[in-house]
Every structure is written in structure tokens, then in C-alpha cells.
């Protein structure tokens, strides 16, 4: 059953029809100008608001709303010691697992890079979907392939009142066209992991969800996002998340996370057209 569904996604994910090649001119007009020459030590992401230190794992807990029901949610994000070259830029690989009611709902690897100016870019995602903890298929988008474009996840100097920015674009079946805008700075927020000052609030939305649906993300300096909220009558998921734990993984735990990320890569269909992920040269992780 899983193999059949995976083959279906392969057809959707690759240019086997005109639908994938199509993207609106509106999307093209609002994309960020991407210059691969403006990246140097790009897998070293040390942006104040979006630091990605290999071996760091963050855990969030909260709720989503599905069919009028409040569903417990848990998200575990791990910065691996893997890198991957996408569209000529070396990215760091982040492994993200979403749990609903204690069961894996989605598992994905996400690719980030920092440019010379300090902006953090999103260059793609490979997402696996599970039904009752059983793998049923995957979807992927990678910048520079099949009409997909990189976007900015965090500005080097985020300021209120500045224009919104594209967080990337991926045509169907992924349908990624999110935008971010700086909402507030200098805020205070308390979550189970602690209380934080100088918090930055980013409002995110998508044309696919409509103008009356936004996700609010709260970023603490030196930590990353610590809280997720929502606003708007059109918001369907109504996800709320709070940071509950920040962990520095042991070499063995990091090796296990690396292995899980590589397994996702092995199951992917787009990866036959890109170089494989590699272990960071500076990594001293064990378990090779």
C-alpha cells in the first residue's frame, strides 16, 4: 500500500504533467532575489533569531484543531550535522517530527542556509506523511527544481514596518507560498522552558489559506522560535506551541538523528537528481 502511494507522489512531484510547471506570475513577482554567489560559509547559521547549531534539539508542546476537536501536538526539531548542496548553496539539514495524539503525523528534513548578509534562507523540504504511524507517502520541493524558489525565513535585521517577504515558493503538490512580516519587537514571552525578553514576533500567511489566516511565531535571541500562535477566522489548524525543552545531544544521539535524516533521504524520489547529504567536516560525532 505504501509503495503504491509513493509512486503516486513521484508522478506528482516530477514534471509528468503541465500542472507542475505552471506557477502564477503573481508568485514570480513577489519572490526574493536569490543570488547563490552571496553565500560563503552558508551551512553555519548563527543568525541571532534563528541559530542552528548542530546537535541542538528543541521540543514543543501544544494543540491543533481538527474537525472541531482540540488535538494534543508535539514537535521535535533536531539540527543535524549533515549538509546538502541545493541550487549551488550548501545547506544545513534540520530533522523535524510532528506528533498528534502521541503518534507520528509528519517527519521531514528541512534545508536552511545563511547568506553573507546574515539572512537565513529556506531552500527546500522533504516531508513524509504517516497514517496511524505507518508511512504512506512523501512530498518534496527543492529550490531551483520544477519551478521552486528559495525564500527568506529570517532577516538579518528584522524591523517592524518593513515589507513582507517570501519564505519560498513550490508549485503543486507541495503548494508552498508562505510570506512573513515583522509584527513586533522588544516583547516578553514566558513558556515552560523559561521567560524571554527582547522577543521578536513574525506573522506568517499564505495565499492558499487566504488573508484572514495567520500564524504568529515568537523568536527569542540566541534561541529561535519559542512560541507559536494564530489569528484570523480563516485559520483552520489553529496551532499553538510552546517551547518546553532545549537539549544538547550526545554524540550517540546525534548519530541516531543523522541516521534518521538519511533514511528519509533514501526514500525520497527527487534526490536522485541532487548530490547526497554529507557529514559536516568539522563534526566530531561518533557512530560512523
Residues of each region from the PLM?
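Sec/Tat signal peptide C-region and signal peptidase I cleavage site
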Residues: 16-20
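Short aromatic loop motif centered on NTY/YTY
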Residues: 149-154, 178
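Bacterial N-terminal signal peptides
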Residues: 2-15
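Detector for methionine-enriched segments
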Residues: 1, 145, 153-154, 280
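Acidic/charged, solvent-exposed loop-and-adjacent secondary-structure segments enriched in E/D, K/R, S/T
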Residues: 134-151
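Acidic, serine/threonine-rich low-complexity disordered tracts
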Residues: 23-116, 122-129, 158-288
